[in-house]
């Protein structure tokens, strides 16, 4: 991490089917060992599964899920006088989306089920309904920030 200049944000190309940058971000987080075509196949199958299950637009279900998972505040460690404090900070939009996608995929991978398609679609549906492991993760983060609100004046 250079102290001299801030790294520029690279533009994210939208995916070929939904023309959505959010989908591209999710697929790039989903892929393993550089196999993006397999990641796209898994994702599109999950979206098809969501459309059949909920009879709603799957992209809207995904957007709602990511919106529900996105944290508003998080805690970061900061050393103050020999003690390490958990300082609550507001989350910027880009970081919030990145955290939401990461938590969504972690929750989907840890879920019990037959394959990643069913696990991912179930987790997205749960997150859009404000339930599921990813939502619990967000609430846990918010609780930790609330508990350490007294250290908010130590912000960076």
From Swiss-Prot:
UniProt similarity note: Belongs to the universal ribosomal protein uS7 family.
UniProt-recorded name of the protein: Small ribosomal subunit protein uS7c
HAMAP family: Ribosomal_uS7_B
InterPro entries, per database record: Ribosomal_uS7, Ribosomal_uS7_bac/org-type, Ribosomal_uS7_CS, Ribosomal_uS7_dom, Ribosomal_uS7_dom_sf
Keyword set, alphabetical order: Chloroplast, Plastid, Ribonucleoprotein, Ribosomal protein, RNA-binding, rRNA-binding
Subcellular localization(s) per the UniProt record: Plastid, Chloroplast
Gene Ontology CC annotation, any one: small ribosomal subunit
PANTHER family referenced in this protein's UniProt entry, alphabetically: RIBOSOMAL PROTEIN S7
Taxonomic source organism: Ostreococcus tauri
GO MF annotation, one: structural constituent of ribosome
A GO biological-process term: translation
One Pfam family this sequence matches: Ribosomal_S7
Lineage: Eukaryota, Viridiplantae, Chlorophyta, Mamiellophyceae, Mamiellales
Source taxon at top rank: Eukaryota
């Amino acid at each position: 991490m250079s102290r001299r200049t801030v790294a520029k944000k690279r533009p994210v190309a939208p995916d070929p089917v939904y023309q959505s940058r959010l989908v591209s971000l999710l697929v790039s987080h989903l892929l393993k060992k550089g196999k993006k075509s397999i990641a796209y196949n898994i994702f599109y199958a999950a979206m098809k599964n969501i459309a059949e299950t909920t009879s709603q637009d799957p992209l809207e279900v995904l957007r709602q899920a990511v919106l529900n998972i996105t944290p508003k505040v998080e805690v970061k460690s900061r050393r103050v006088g020999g003690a390490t404090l958990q300082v609550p900070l507001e989350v910027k939009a880009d970081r919030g989306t990145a955290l939401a996608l990461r938590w969504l995929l972690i929750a989907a991978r840890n879920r019990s089920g037959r394959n990643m398609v069913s696990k991912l679609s179930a987790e997205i549906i749960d997150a859009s309904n404000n339930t599921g492991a990813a939502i619990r993760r967000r609430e846990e983060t918010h609780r930790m920030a609330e508990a350490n609100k007294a250290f908010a004046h130590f912000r960076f």
